[in-house]
Every structure is written in structure tokens, then in C-alpha cells.
Amino acid sequence: MSFVAPDDRAYYNYSRAPGSAHGVGHESTSPDQRLPSSHSYNKSASAPNESPNQVYHPEMAGPPGSSHSYPPQPMTPLTGSTAYPPQHPPSGSYYLPTQQQQQQQSEQHIPSPPSSSNRPPSATGYTPDGQPIIPVGVSGGKMFRCRGYGDCDKVFTRSEHLARHVRKHTGERPFPCHCGKAFSRLDNLRQHAATVHAEQAQLNETMLASLAPIHAALSQRASREQRRRGEVVEVPKGAVERRRETRKAQAAAAQAAAANGHSQQNSPYAQYHESQWNAPPHPRPRTNGGYDYPYVPEHSLNDDAGPSRRPSSSAGYGYQQGYYDSARPPTAPGTGSSGESMSGLPYPYRPMSASGRELPVPAHYSESEPPATAHGPPPQSPMYGNVPPAQQQPPNWSSPPPGHGAYPPHDAAAYPPPPEGYYHPAHAAHGSYPPREDVYEYHPPGWQGQYPPAATNGGPYAQGYGTGAPPTAPPPHESPFQYNVANPGAEGYPYQNYDSRKRRAEDDFGKDDRKHPRPSSPSNSQVPDSSTAAHANGAHDAPHPHPHPGAAPGNGAMDPPRPHDPNWLPATSERRGSLAISALLGSPPKTMRSRPSTADGGAAGAHGYESYHYDPHGQVSDDQQTGVDKEREKKEEVKQQDDKKTQ
């Protein structure tokens, strides 16, 4: 909306100005007037609702001496309503202009707008011969010019376009909705009803049908008022039609570029194409609901797109590559220009266009890039730094453990496969992890299928083995987390074929069958020598040799079950363990018997169960069988004594 100049009409709701209540109107003339020159068509910003073909926007200034070639146009005094068109408060009922309202409006005397001769002539478009340049399709017809609202001199090609434009100045909204919201244009109300009140279709149709005569009446009245006010201007048939232009600011941009050309040459910034920074042209509405956009030549986006733009981008910009190559110094040693500094980079570091074509790079991009020496392959990881070739680093089994940086990277070509017929040895080491090479199939040079490799100092193993202590350092190609055990051949080393399923192993490695043997006679509570117990059980151990030679007899419950004496009972300390093992392994259950407690049992009664020797293989010795018979006799005697007491 235009602002009103203080010298012009400041009361543009047709209210009286101070001291002009009875102002004299100008001489009325015919509405069909020729095109004036003193008050020509001003180039002002078009309203958002108007399309470019509706508004007359001349761009070229008139030739010297031709701005007053036509006599000034006298204005017709207005005798219409106070607010044109009439504005009524929106209400629920729809209205039509009544005769009473029209009579009241006609009684008010409204001064006419000031004469156009009082204003300075505005720039208009003329040919070199002095003919005005008009919009396309208006030659020999009429144009409708906005007058009386400050400096607004917009020209429209249709009467209804001028009528709805005037409502922007007056603030009139003659089309109310049933929700209470009013609009200045009927098409805006129709769109509002279709979107906001889409579910009230019947009510919308009734409302629009009632507003149709209002719209027709407003159009007729606007046409009459436009002729009365001299807003209808005939266009001579010889007028030159203005060429349809896609960019309205091209001429102004060319003049500005020519005026500032000398200063732009020394500017530190690139010269961009002015047409790329202008707002897009207003679309031309079509009858089918779409828009026609004028053709915009893409002359500046084909060969000079920027590094972050694509040739099809409307926001792309162009620049002069010569400026970037010469105006800035090289940013890294050995780089002459920004194009050379990044020309050897691979794709992720070099800007490319959508078609795969390399794009020039501005100098400010290369200011932040690393030196040219950094464009080689990526640096090696510090984990593998300073590593000599594997062939030049023999294994050292007595040196301190090297750091992680000494481990060479895995390279299949550097480590030949093992010889034919080689199989990894069984993991006989108890308490250690398997060698790292067995787990990862990693064979360093010098590996010949033995672990650890034979030393050259005459001993069967390297330094540190056989002394009962771990070696001083692990081999260099071995995992630093591996547990190194003592000499496997030394006495006390666990069994070669250790079975982890064994629940218990003996301490003396075959010298005794149990940890704490029992006395062989009921009267003797002393623990006999382990050799005696072993000799007593030798007959039973002989027929059942251990499956693994060299391994001590383990838990007998793991062996196949053998026939048991149903009356045999183990010692108290052995009952729970043996029963638990039997229950887990499915052995025949043993009948639990309570320990006899007699007053005259004495030491024999107290140690009656200690005379048995538990054979882990399920056999009962002769001494144990004798003790069982004696215990049975004692029980019978105790039972007889109890019977006598009860009798």
C-alpha cells in the first residue's frame, strides 16, 4: 500500500479536508479522454494480487521536451459515496445497496482529487517518435488508471481489476463469510469456504449464491464511478505495444553496471550476474487453475556454476575463474593457483558437477586445504609404524616383550603356509590358552610346527623353561595375554591327556587310591600307610587298568558301574559325595543305614565304619567283608537284647 505525500490528498476516504467543505469542483469533461502526458503512468510496485499483464509499468523515460506534449486532463468531481464502494459492517445477513443508502450518499458533497497538473510528471515509456508504449493487447482499447489515492497511478486493463485494487486503499470487505470473516474479493471467500468450511458444503453454496448479486451490483457501480472520475483512458490506435519482457530490471541493471563498471573492476569481490539475484517473475494465471511462467534463459548457469551449485539450480552463481587464479596468492607450497592446487585430488575432495565434469574451485576454498604433500595416501596407523619387514626380524625368545607396534600386519604373502602333512599338536598344556597361531591361523617365519621352537643353546627348550618359573618373556609373535606354563616334562606337571570331565584327581599321581585312607581293622583307628592300602587294592586295580597310561586313578564313579554289595555302607565323610555322584551318573542307589549307637559298643562301635576301605571302583576288600560280617552279628545281638528288655 502506498503512503500518501503530505502535499497530496491525505484524506482518501473522501472526507472533507480542512477549509474545503465547499470546494469548487473542476470542470467536468467527457470520460473519453486522450492519454495525458503530464500525469503519465508511474512505475510502482504491483500489488500481490495483480499480475504483470494487468498493470502498466513503463520503464523508459520520455524523450526531452515530450513530457508535456498533451494538455493536462481535468478531473471530474466525485459525487459518490463517502467510501467507494460502500462499506457495511459484516453481519449474518447479506445485503444489497438500498435506494435510501444511495440517496444519503448522493447528498454528501465530496471534493474531487487534486489535478494531476499539480504533481511532477512521472516517467513513462515512449518511442523515439514520442508515441507512448502501452501494454500488449490494449492498443485501440481502454485502460483503467487508479487515481485519487496519493501517488498510486497503477493502470489496469480491466475494470474489475481496478475495482478490487481500490478496495485495498479503502479497506472495504463486502463479502462476509457465515463464520464472521469478511473478504475484499469474492474468489478469496470462495477459496476460504472450500478449505476451512469444506464440511459445510450446503451452507457454502447458499452463501455464495446470495453474494452473487452483490458482486454484480458492485461491478456495475464501479464501472460507472470509474467513468465519472475519469479513470477510464482511451488508448490511441497508433500506440506502440510494449514487448513482453521476462526481467523488468534488465535495463536498470545494465545502466547500473555501465555506470559502476570502472569501480567493479577493482572490487575484491566477484561480479555476479544481476539477473540471477532478482525475484522470479509473477506467474500469469491461467483458466485451468495453473500458472504460466515466462521463459527465463539459462545463459549464466551453464558453464560457470559454483562449486556447491549444480547447472540446473536456479540459485547458482557464476564467477570469473581468471580472477580467482590471479588475484589471490597461492595458499600452499607448490601450488600456483586454486585450480592447480585441487586438480589432483580424488573425487571426494574435488567439486564435480552433476554430469561428472570438474568444476573450478574458488581461492577461498583452497585457503583451508592442507599442503600439497598431504594429498598422498593416508598416513599409516601408529600401531604399525617403524616395522621392519618380517623376513628381517627373526624370532627372539629371550628378549623382553615388544610393544604392540612391533607386531607386523597380517599379510598372507609374508607368511608361507606350513609344510605338507603338518597338523597342529594337541593342546596338552593345562591352564594355558592355545597358541595364537592356532586360533588365528597366523604362522610367522621360522614356525616349524613345534611350540615353542627349539632353541639353539643346546637345551630342549628356550631359556626359562624347566626351572619351575615362567619364562622371562613371551615369544614376539605370541599373544601378550597368553599364560606360559612351566616345563611340561618336569615332575608335577599335569597329565598329558587331562580330561576336564574328571571331577577329582589324586594328589600323589597313582601312589594311593584316596586322599585319607581308613584303618584296616575296627580295633585300630590309626591310619595305615598308603602303600598298604594300595597293596590291598592291587588285585582289584589290576583287572581294570586306567584308560590313559601315566594318569593317576581318578574318580571311580566315572568308570562303568560294577556289582555292589547291598549291605556295604561307605564312611560318613564319603556318603554324601558318593551318593551325589551316583545320583548324577545313574548308579544303583544304596540303602542308607543309621549308625548303631550302643552303650557297650566302646571303641569298636565308635569306629565300626572306619574299618572299611572305600574302593572307587566299587569292589570290597577281604578286610572290609570281614568287618561287614562282624557288624551284622553285632546288630543281631543288639536286637536280641532289645527284645529281652521289652519282654
UniProtKB/Swiss-Prot annotation:
SUPFAM superfamilies from the xrefs?
beta-beta-alpha zinc fingers
Cellular location(s): Nucleus; Cytoplasm
Zn finger spans (C2H2-type): 144-169, 175-197
Q: Where is the composition biased (Polar residues)?
A: 27-54, 66-84, 261-278
Biased-composition ranges for Low complexity?
A: 97-122, 249-259, 312-327, 404-414, 421-434, 521-540
Classification via Pfam families? zf-C2H2 (PF00096)
What turns on expression?
Expression is induced by nutrient starvation. Basal expression is positively regulates by HOB1.
Which SMART domains does the UniProt record give? ZnF_C2H2 (SM00355)
Record keywords, A-Z = Cytoplasm, Melanin biosynthesis, Metal-binding, Nucleus, Repeat, Virulence, Zinc, Zinc-finger
Q: Where is this region: Disordered?
A: 1-132, 220-647
Keyword tRNA processing on entry:
no
A single GO molecular function, which one?
zinc ion binding
**Primary subcellular site in the record, as a coarse category:** nucleus
Q: What does this protein do?
A: Transcription factor that promotes pheromone gene expression, which results in a subsequent increase in cell fusion. Also promotes production of melanin and capsule and thereby is required for full virulence.
The name this protein carries in UniProt is C2H2 finger domain transcription factor USV101
- What species is given as this protein's source? Cryptococcus neoformans var. grubii serotype A (strain H99 / ATCC 208821 / CBS 10515 / FGSC 9487) (Filobasidiella neoformans var. grubii)
